[in-house]
Amino acid sequence: MSTSIQSFLGNQYKTYLVLFLCALIIGIKLGTLIPLLSLILESRGYSNTQIGLNVVAQPLAVILFVRITPLIIHKIGLARSIVIAQIFTILLYFTFPIFESLTAWFFIRFLIGFAGALAWNAFDTWMLSMADDSNRGKIVTIYNTVFVIGFAIGPMVI
């Protein structure tokens, strides 16, 4: 690793690189899931309104559960929260082909939103706990930029 990257990110640069890689992967995952599921629903003949309401399930869960996720993180820890949320999300992805009902997909997406809220809070807590006053702004900027890049890459994967 070059010393310029290490000096820019600080002593914990390897941990930050892992964090940024996770942000990229989660961005790609979300950026792929939203349009892919919408295209599948459209091919099944659902209206744009029905598809839009289905898409709302994930952010709705984030809004409803973001206040309790810190309690879960405190109880089971940062690393476990991240791992459990990601495993839960991956398992939920495999349920889409099993259930064809729009209502079932709403609940699956809602649960993915809950897991996303847990992971989001855990990642943000991890990132902010590592950053100090001298690099916090840089770290948050890189983290969010990498996430958005992943989100932009997602539709290109389809």
Task: Kindly label every feature range from the protein language model.
Residues 80-94:
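Structural signature of the two symmetry-related core transmembrane helices
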Residues 55, 59, 140-148:
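Small-residue-rich transmembrane alpha-helices and their cytosolic helix-loop interfaces
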Residues 59-67, 151-152:
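Residue-level signature of mid-helix packing/kink "hotspots" within the transmembrane helices
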Residues 103-111:
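Paired small-residue
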Residues 77, 98-100:
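Helix-breaking motifs and short loop linkers at transmembrane-helix boundaries and internal kinks
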Residues 65-77:
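Helix-to-loop junctions at the C-terminal end of transmembrane segments
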Residues 11-59:
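Helix-loop boundary and gating motifs at the non-cytosolic
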Residues 118-131:
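Intracellular juxtamembrane helix-capping segments at the cytosolic ends
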